[in-house]
Amino acid sequence: MGEFPGYFELDKFWQQDFLYPLIFQEYIYALAHDHVLNRFILLDNFGYDNKSSSLVVKRLITRMCQQNHLIISANDSNQNPLWGHNKNLYSQIISEGFAVIVEIPFSLRLVAYVERKEIVKSQNQNLRSIHSIFPFLEDNFVHLNYVSDILIPYPIHLELEVQTLRSWFKDASFLHLLRFLLYEYQNCNRLSTLTPKKSISIVSKSNQRFFLFLYNSYVCEYESIFIFLCNQSSHLRSTSFGTLVERIYFYGKRETLVEVVSNDFSLVLWLCKNPLMHYVRYQGKAILASKGTPLLMKKWKYYLVNFWQCHLSVWSNPVRIHINQLSNHSFGFLGYLASVRVNRSMVRSQMLE
């Protein structure tokens, strides 16, 4: 048993202001303040062929804030079916342009990480084929005893997304615009339940890039701390984790010192050291395999549940983590059902006189 320090290096890699506040500047606070749909909205519809850029986003914000003879009141939205469609179009293009801009620093960090790993250009373009995972499983999982099939929880409340990114980006304009887009999406979903035949329901299908950015930022927050503690507690092998690390779009080691709330983790930081443990994440699930005992796997299960609840404020049901013995159970991975075959051998001994 060992106790780990309550400090670790955390890379808040873009704490300075973004470029886009210099572009939008005077529009962001007015737009974020008015997210309850009580302002005037333009009636005319502008088609941009699903193309998003900072210039398009700025023009849309300008037209949404202007008032002329083409505007209608939000109270008249029930009488005019085109109002909701135009509002959704603006929110969609703004969120798409927002996602493009905020992906820039993450892309730069990914390129820097690839250069540090000295990956050749041909491999960099493909970012490690997914088929390389299966030889890894065949070579390593046959020597393991237990595997935990983990369903990664996702924050339900919108404000948790803002809190997660607040420690990454020290930019008030960024947080205001993010909060506006999230509440705008929530309002559209509420309206879609009342008017299912209208075009409001297309918002969830059209903003995939924006929500993919939010999901990856949340996963990066979770994995950066989790992998650090795994390295401290169980010597998680970099070669095992490296099979998927190039495919994690927002991976990066963190540099700024922050304090883990020691009171929250006082009961779960006591972990047994295990010389062999592997972690693999795919889609919204993860696999944690070990050569340890059932008690060790239960300790990790207890730790993960408390980690999500205490640090990320995400409630996780313990039944979402299944612990199985590889010799008796199989586990699903990337659409395949994997299991370990137990080879029984007969040993004969003869007494020598």
From Swiss-Prot:
GO terms for cellular component: chloroplast. Keywords: Chloroplast, mRNA processing, Plastid, RNA-binding, tRNA processing. InterPro entries: Maturase_MatK, Maturase_MatK_N. Pfam families: MatK_N. It is found in: Plastid, Chloroplast. GO terms for molecular function: RNA binding. The keyword Kinase does not apply. One of its GO terms (biological process) is tRNA processing. Belongs to the intron maturase 2 family. MatK subfamily. Usually encoded in the trnK tRNA gene intron. Probably assists in splicing its own and other chloroplast group II introns. This is Maturase K.
